[in-house]
Regions:
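A generic structural signal for short hydrophobic patches within well-formed alpha-helices
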Residues: 27, 117-118, 219, 318, ...
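Rossmann-like dinucleotide/flavin-binding elements
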Residues: 233-272, 359, 365-367, 373-426, ...
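A Rossmann-like FAD-binding core segment of flavoenzymes
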Residues: 298-344, 349-351, 405-517, 560-581
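Short aromatic/basic micro-patch
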Residues: 21, 55, 78, 111, ...
Length: 581
């Protein structure tokens, strides 16, 4: 079966879910919170780029949803009686990717405002399942649609930053295309928009407007990912819980906290999902007997948190945390580019860990153009019918090797040790060893990298024999572990010798706890009300399911911490203030 055949099969299999109609009972539940409107041919419901659209239900008439491609309208879908219009941008509050217009002489609709829609999806299960399942499936179909333009990244094929924009949009599940400037399509697009090589990389928004050499923050603003946390002229943002980091631990905490009524804000520096979001297939996650793509799993978790009212801001880089133990809002968080201060009653640190870099000559030259830290469909295209190198001996390396082996000619799994089973799960190690086009190179390291504009070959050395070999390859995948992202934290938050955050019994004798009437919760840090979960925490099990469990467990401790404050048993310590540096 060709890729086109698989796409056609996917569209057939998902059509009934993506375009489900609402029944009488569901309409009766939504009607009290909806506005009934009569429209005529040519009336526009919403335009591409608009935000906070709410839900439109067609009672009578016909509505086309279309996009503009280089001046021509292309209809994506036509809505009839009992159909509803939209995709997951309605949940997220991000920018509409298309325009909707009345095409019948007359039409009657029900419009559910965005604020009422979020409440309905959280509180009315009879409605939420049909709508949310459809919105998710529509986005999946849209991302798979080869004709849909969406956002377009125009760049040279070897432009490192252009590929970073591509990666950023991909990991944030924004439908987009990467277009090589030198291609026929790229040249035609650049001529129509009057772009030259000096303008690259350029992001062409779904509206058709070009954004020359944008920062990731500007990309996020155009895509609607960077949501304003504060209203204009506000100097403070208040939250019950602020979660820093949207990996599995942070996302799980967001779902539980928001569903339990806490005003929850999640700050993510790049894209939700963490390292799990970069995993092509997680096979040992509870409830998925055939495995699940890590990016898809964490995206669903993000949408689940949105449904319960959690507020995300991406990319939001936290610069510092100031602590005042005697205040109701004891944590003050400074965010890069945000004029307002975020104040929180409790904070969960779920920043995970950064990828470690290979100590190979010329490695810096090929970051993003040959050296990668995730194996997804984007990278898989580069590796098709090629020999590729994966470095590492843990589960991430094994999963990457298995995923790449499906399309690559050969996968060389390079490990420094002599036993693949020491760090890798047994089931995965056996699968890697049995895969015919995966070769494991024990006691081997990558020494040098070569290439012109992109990576072309690497030099490998056997540490035992000293023998060196040169391998022709377009890609090296580095899966050699990570270091905790804790440099922004104040020194009063205690860490172990490797920089991971101490919690629970390990901080019971910290100064802030010695004079406190209660003991720290299992995931609470050396500062009361500040929690840590997932890979950033000292002693945590570095697995996706474990991080999810810790996220949920942290929320239980947060409720206990907030209750102790309400009951009048705050810290007896005098005011403590901490900040970065």
């Amino acid at each position: 079966m060709t890729e086109e055949d698989r796409d056609e099969q996917f569209y057939r299999d998902t059509e009934s879910v993506a375009f489900a109609k609402l029944d009488d009972h569901q309409l009766s539940l939504l009607e009290p919170i909806a506005q009934r409107r009569n429209l005529k041919r040519g009336d526009v419901l919403f335009k591409v780029g608009q935000r906070n659209l709410g839900l439109t239900i067609v009672l009578r008439g016909e509505i086309d949803v279309f996009e503009q491609r280089d001046g021509t309208e292309y209809v994506l879908a036509t809505a009839h009686e009992r159909d509803f219009i939209g995709d997951v941008s309605m949940l997220q509050g991000t920018s509409a990717l298309a325009t909707a217009r009345i095409t019948s002489d007359e039409a009657e609709i029900l419009h559910v405002p965005a604020s009422e829609l979020r409440r309905a999806l959280a509180e009315i299960p009879a409605v939420s399942k049909t709508i949310v399942d459809a919105l998710i499936m529509r986005r999946r179909r849209l991302r798979r649609d080869r004709e849909f333009a969406g956002f377009r990244v125009l760049a040279q094929s070897d432009d490192r930053y252009g590929h970073q924009i591509d990666d950023f949009l991909d990991k944030n599940h924004v439908p987009h295309r990467f277009i090589d400037f030198a291609s026929e399509q790229g040249q035609g697009l650049s001529q129509r928009l009057h772009l030259t090589s000096r303008d690259l990389p350029t992001l062409i928004a779904a509206t058709g407007s070009p954004l020359r050499r944008p920062s990731l923050r500007e990309v996020a603003q155009v895509a609607g990912l960077l949501r304003p946390l504060a209203r204009e002229n506000e100097t403070e943002i208040l939250s019950d819980l602020t979660i820093v980091g949207a990996g599995p631990a942070g996302l799980a905490a967001a779902v539980y906290a928001a569903s339990e009524g806490l005003n929850t804000v999640i700050l993510e520096s790049y894209a939700p999902g963490g390292q799990a979001g970069s995993s092509s297939l997680i096979e040992n996650f509870f409830g998925f007997p055939t495995g699940i793509n890590g990016g898809y799993l964490t995206w669903l978790a993000q949408l689940q948190a949105y449904r319960f009212g959690a507020k995300f801001s991406t990319p939001s880089q936290v610069l510092s945390l100031n602590y005042n133990g005697d205040s109701e809002y004891r944590a003050c968080i400074e965010i890069e580019g945000c004029p307002a201060t975020l104040r929180a009653k409790a904070v969960l640190i779920a920043t995970g860990a950064d990828y470690r870099r290979l100590e190979a000559e010329n490695r810096e030259r090929f970051e993003g153009v040959g050296v990668y830290y995730a194996a997804t469909a984007l990278e898989g295209q580069i590796c098709r019918n090629e020999t590729v190198v994966v470095v590492g001996s843990g589960n991430s390396a094994g999963q990457a090797a298995m995923f790449l082996s499906d399309g690559a000619k050969k996968v060389l799994l390079v490990i420094r040790g002599d036993d693949i089973t020491k760090k890798m799960s047994d089931y995965l190690a056996r699968r890697v060893q049995a895969q015919p086009n995966i070769e494991i190179l024990y006691r081997t390291e990558v020494r040098k990298m070569f290439g012109d504009q992109r990576l072309e070959q690497v030099e490998l050395e056997n540490a035992k024999t000293g023998e060196r070999q040169t391998v022709k390859t377009p890609a090296v995948f580095s899966m050699i572990g990570a270091r905790p992202c804790t440099e922004w934290l104040p020194p009063e938050i205690e860490r172990d010798e490797k920089g991971f955050i101490k919690t629970g019994a390990d901080v019971a004798e910290a100064p802030a706890w010695r004079e406190n009437e209660r003991r720290p919760a299992p995931l609470e840090t050396s500062l009361p009300g500040i929690f840590a979960a997932g890979d950033v925490r000292s002693g945590s099990v570095k697995r996706c399911a474990a991080a999810v469990g810790e996220g949920g467990m942290a929320v239980a401790g947060i409720h206990m911490s907030l209750a102790s404050r309400r009951n009048g048993s705050p810290s007896k310590t005098s005011q403590q203030r901490t900040n970065r540096g």
